Amino acid sequence: MVAGINLMQETKSIRDVEIEGKRVLIRVDFNVPMDSDFNISDDTRIREAIPTINHCIDNGAKSIVLVSHLGRPRGKSSEFSLKHILKRLERLLNRSVIFVESLEGVSSVMATLPQKSVILLENIRFLEGEEKNDEKLSKNLASLCDIYINDAFGASHRKHASTYGVAKFAPVKVAGLLLKKEIDSFAKALASPLKPVLLIVGGSKVSSKITLLSNILDVVDKIVIGGAMSNTFLKSLGYDMQRSLVEDPLVPEAAKILGLAKQKGVKIYLPVDVVCTDDIKNPKEIKITPAQDVPENFLAADIGPASVKLFGEVIRDCETIIWNGPMGVYEVQNFSRGTFQLAHVVADTYAYSVIGGGDTADAIDRAGEKDNMSFTSTGGGASLELLEGKILPAFEVLERK
């Protein structure tokens, strides 16, 4: 794991290349959440791309083409058009941005624009070849630039034309400032951390975190497991979890991880009590019970107050904290307390805290602690793969120092 992170840290960034007079193509991640009226509910990913775009403007780039996806469209769809983010992007950049609907139109537009112009290409996933890493599309994208910059950490685990294929044909290919910040922040937590190191892991499925748990035992000193995935671990201890979400085929795997952690001297903490209910959406009854005493026909939906107290003590004892996955169904107010209270505890420590993207970042934001964490990643799946010890495909094709 550490070797892979160190290798990714050696990637050249835009600070290592001459940009003046060059045509630049930046793969950004503008995949932001929007409501039914296309109002952006969280513009973090757009904000995080601004420093790289401004660096190119300030250093005299001839033209700047921005490429991103939005959602998972099946062909062209107005619902997933990047037109919806254009005004927010212009406001954050404090300059006008030219929107181009087709790849073919970019070259002709570029020929007529003044120096330092910024162009936003329509959703790259509208093009069939994007997710197939199509060679022709990759070459077409590369033809638009002298320098290819990947700044889309949230998509850096994908082998797509705009994140992977294009780099093979671009004359120069480097990391943007966000991509560099992401890898350096994870390196601080994983490759050269202050100890003790704690992993807080949650979410609904053990299956999505098995590789992470197996590989990170050599890096961390303690692990707190919450969320529905803790049910599978509790069942491996012989607890009857009633209607709680349990991945029965993975109960032996959970027991194996507990045994392996013990061998390596890594202390694992599981919930000692849970908030359980008869129904998550329309609960008639909500109870706090010991983890081993979930009532018949009930299911665990959050960690209980004794677990919050226990986990809080563990958190306060650590110098580095990595958090991936919520402690309960935090989107529902009745079952959000465990996640939110742990967020407050982490925020109150002096520890270096790294928050995995996706649900974890959303939960921390809802808890009002987003600005009190050392670093919050913009990538959900990408941060998980990084924690699993993988070298992300986007880094494989960028130049090294």
Swiss-Prot record:
Pathway: Carbohydrate degradation; glycolysis; pyruvate from D-glyceraldehyde 3-phosphate: step 2/5. GO terms for molecular function: ADP binding; ATP binding; phosphoglycerate kinase activity. InterPro entries: Phosphoglycerate_kinase (IPR001576), Phosphoglycerate_kinase_CS (IPR015911), Phosphoglycerate_kinase_N (IPR015824), Phosphoglycerate_kinase_sf (IPR036043). Keywords: ATP-binding, Cytoplasm, Glycolysis, Kinase, Nucleotide-binding, Transferase. Substrate binds at D29, F30, N31, R45, H69, L70, G71, R72, R125, R158. GO terms for biological process: gluconeogenesis; glycolytic process. It is found in: Cytoplasm. Signal peptide: none annotated. ATP binds at K209, E331, G357, G358, D359, T360. Its EC number is 2.7.2.3. One of its GO terms (cellular component) is cytosol. Belongs to the phosphoglycerate kinase family. This is Phosphoglycerate kinase. The lineage of its organism: Bacteria, Pseudomonadati, Campylobacterota, Epsilonproteobacteria, Campylobacterales.
